[in-house]
């Protein structure tokens, strides 16, 4: 199944997974970009954003749990985030944290907050519509993800 065919299925978990990948890239880039400032609150939220990018990486690409040496506690925590509702909750929490970064003043972390919130909405819509989680083949789903989880 090509990427175009995956998007044509109208399964919101596929949209959520790809928005999650975009969120990961944004969180990584913006976390690094905003860490070089003199505002302590912004530095704290930048570090949280940077950590979120690595958590998202393990959530969206489950093959990495097999490849990377991580603790069993971390593996168990990531494996619990397997349903659409759990993913929506995880992304919503990360999004709310980034929205809270605006308390210290406007910054580019708002882009991460927007994408994390959009990802949470996609996963929540997939859950509400009763769509089963379908992993993108491009990201290691359909067979590879099932073997690991």
UniProtKB/Swiss-Prot annotation:
Its main location: Golgi. Glycans are attached at residue 11. The chain crosses the membrane at residues 18-38, 41-61, 86-106, 108-128. The keyword Transmembrane helix applies. GO terms for biological process: vesicle-mediated transport. InterPro entries: TVP18/Ca-channel_flower. It is found in: Golgi apparatus membrane. It is a multi-pass membrane protein. One of its GO terms (cellular component) is membrane. Keywords: Glycoprotein, Golgi apparatus, Membrane, Transmembrane, Transmembrane helix. Golgi membrane protein involved in vesicular trafficking. Belongs to the TVP18 family. This is Golgi apparatus membrane protein TVP18. It comes from Pyricularia oryzae (strain 70-15 / ATCC MYA-4617 / FGSC 8958).
